[in-house]
C-alpha cells in the first residue's frame, strides 16, 4: 500500500489557513498555492537520488552531495494543477512539464481525455502529478492510469487538500503511488466539495465561477 504523507510543517499550516479563507483574493491565493507547493516539493523529494562530487572551495577541496542526473517531470491536472507548477519548478527548475486534461462522461461516468501532452521520454522520468484538490479521487486516479499506460513508472501525487474518500480510491487503484498532501480534511459534502476545504481551487486561482 502507498504511503500518505501529511506535511504538517508550521509554515504549511499557516499558509493553508490563509488559502482556505474566503476573504483571500485571487492574487494572494495564487501566491499561497505556489508557496505551499514549494514546501510540499521539499518533502516529496526527500528520497531523490544523489551523487558525491568533489568541489573546490576558496579554502580547500572537499566532497559534496548533489542531486543525480535522474530526470524528473511535473504533470499538472488541468486546470487547477497549473497553479502548483511554479512552486515545484522553483526547487526543480530542470524538470520537464507535461499536461493532462480529462473530464467524466455524464452518461457512462468514464474518463474522457481531452488533452495530453507529455515529455517524449516520460518512461525514464520520476513523475510528480499535481492537483490542489483530491476530492473523490477520480481525476487523479484516471490521470495516474493514463501516465502508466504511456510508460511512466515512478509516480507521486501531490495535493494541497484531500478528502479521505479520494485517498482511499487512489490507494485502491494505485497502491504503488505515494501521496503528499498539506491537509487531510474531514469528508466530502453532498455536492462533492471537500469539507472544510477551500472551495473550487480553479475558480479561485483564475477568478471564475
Swiss-Prot record:
Pfam families in the cross-refs: UPRTase
* The keyword Transferase appears for this protein: yes
Going by the UniProt record, its keywords in alphabetical order are: Allosteric enzyme, Glycosyltransferase, GTP-binding, Magnesium, Nucleotide-binding, Transferase
Tagged with keyword Ribonucleoprotein: no
Per the entry, which co-factors are needed? Mg(2+)
Annotated positions binding 5-phospho-alpha-D-ribose 1-diphosphate: 79, 104, 131-139, 200
Q: Which residues bind uracil?
A: 194, 199-201
| Record-linked SUPFAM superfamilies | PRTase-like (SSF53271)
Instruction: Output the Gene Ontology terms for molecular function.
Output: GTP binding; magnesium ion binding; uracil phosphoribosyltransferase activity
EC nos: 2.4.2.9
Q: How is the cofactor bound?
A: Binds 1 Mg(2+) ion per subunit. The magnesium is bound as Mg-PRPP.
Check the record and name the InterPro entries matching this protein: PRibTrfase_dom, PRTase-like, Upp_B, UPRTase/APRTase, Ura_phspho_trans
Membership in a protein family:
Belongs to the UPRTase family.
Return the NCBIfam families for the record. Answer: PRK00129.1 (NF001097), upp (TIGR01091)
As for what it does, the entry says: Catalyzes the conversion of uracil and 5-phospho-alpha-D-ribose 1-diphosphate (PRPP) to UMP and diphosphate.
- Name of this chain's protein: Uracil phosphoribosyltransferase
Amino acid at each position: 500500500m502507498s504511503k500518505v504523507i501529511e506535511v504538517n510543517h508550521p509554515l504549511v499550516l499557516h499558509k493553508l489557513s490563509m488559502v482556505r479563507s474566503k476573504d483571500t483574493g485571487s492574487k494572494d491565493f495564487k501566491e499561497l498555492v505556489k508557496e505551499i507547493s514549494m514546501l510540499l516539493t521539499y518533502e516529496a523529494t526527500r528520497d531523490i537520488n544523489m551523487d558525491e562530487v568533489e568541489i573546490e572551495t576558496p579554502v580547500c577541496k572537499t566532497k559534496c552531495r548533489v542531486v543525480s542526473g535522474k530526470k524528473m517531470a511535473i504533470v499538472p491536472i488541468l486546470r487547477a494543477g497549473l497553479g502548483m507548477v511554479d512552486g515545484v519548478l522553483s526547487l526543480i527548475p530542470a524538470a520537464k512539464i507535461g499536461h493532462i486534461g480529462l473530464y467524466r462522461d455524464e452518461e457512462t461516468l468514464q474518463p474522457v481525455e481531452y488533452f495530453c501532452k507529455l515529455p517524449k521520454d516520460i518512461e525514464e522520468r520520476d513523475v510528480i502529478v499535481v492537483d490542489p484538490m483530491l476530492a473523490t479521487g477520480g481525476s487523479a486516479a484516471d490521470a495516474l492510469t493514463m501516465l502508466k499506460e504511456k510508460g511512466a513508472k515512478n509516480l507521486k501525487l501531490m495535493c494541497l487538500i484531500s478528502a479521505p474518500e479520494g485517498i482511499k480510491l487512489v490507494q485502491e487503484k494505485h497502491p504503488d503511488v505515494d501521496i503528499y498532501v498539506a491537509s487531510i480534511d474531514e469528508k466530502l459534502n453532498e455536492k462533492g466539495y471537500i469539507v472544510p476545504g477551500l472551495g473550487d481551487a480553479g475558480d479561485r486561482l483564475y477568478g471564475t465561477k
